[in-house]
Amino acid sequence: MAESWSGQALQALPATVLGALGALGSEFLREWEAQDMRVTLFKLLLLWLVLSLLGIQLAWGFYGNTVTGLYHRPGLGGQNGSTPDGSTHFPSWEMAANEPLKTHRE
């Protein structure tokens, strides 16, 4: 008699597990549908994030070399290049009238 009881329990186990999973799934769906505005807002924000990242990737593909070229100067000064020749000659309006001209060593 014990064998028939355990055999029936084993046969009923998959149906019980599937019934519990079905109840859990239906409860989850009810909660999901009840939070409709939150779900919609989440989907919109997720879509905005994905589209923004794709736009950045696409723009970098088109303009990446141009942007890199703006910040990279070939020369002896390293990654950003050397100092241009005319950069140390400031116009007189940028210096105070009584201030002496400073050199790089000061």
Curated annotation (Swiss-Prot):
<feature type="topological domain" description="Cytoplasmic">
    <location>
        <begin position="30"/>
        <end position="43"/>
    </location>
</feature>
<keyword id="KW-1133">Transmembrane helix</keyword>
<dbReference type="InterPro" id="IPR016560">
    <property type="entry name" value="TCTA"/>
</dbReference>
<protein>
    <recommendedName>
        <fullName>T-cell leukemia translocation-altered gene protein homolog</fullName>
    </recommendedName>
</protein>
<comment type="function">
    <text>May be required for cellular fusion during osteoclastogenesis.</text>
</comment>
<comment type="similarity">
    <text>Belongs to the TCTA family.</text>
</comment>
<dbReference type="GO" id="GO:0072675">
    <property type="term" value="P:osteoclast fusion"/>
</dbReference>
<dbReference type="GO" id="GO:0016020">
    <property type="term" value="C:membrane"/>
</dbReference>
<feature type="region of interest" description="Disordered">
    <location>
        <begin position="74"/>
        <end position="106"/>
    </location>
</feature>
<feature type="transmembrane region" description="Helical">
    <location>
        <begin position="9"/>
        <end position="29"/>
    </location>
</feature>
<feature type="transmembrane region" description="Helical">
    <location>
        <begin position="44"/>
        <end position="64"/>
    </location>
</feature>
<feature type="modified residue" description="N-acetylalanine">
    <location>
        <position position="2"/>
    </location>
</feature>
<feature type="topological domain" description="Extracellular">
    <location>
        <begin position="2"/>
        <end position="8"/>
    </location>
</feature>
<feature type="compositionally biased region" description="Polar residues">
    <location>
        <begin position="81"/>
        <end position="90"/>
    </location>
</feature>
<dbReference type="Pfam" id="PF15128">
    <property type="entry name" value="T_cell_tran_alt"/>
</dbReference>
<keyword id="KW-0007">Acetylation</keyword>
<keyword id="KW-0812">Transmembrane</keyword>
<feature type="topological domain" description="Extracellular">
    <location>
        <begin position="65"/>
        <end position="106"/>
    </location>
</feature>
<keyword id="KW-0472">Membrane</keyword>
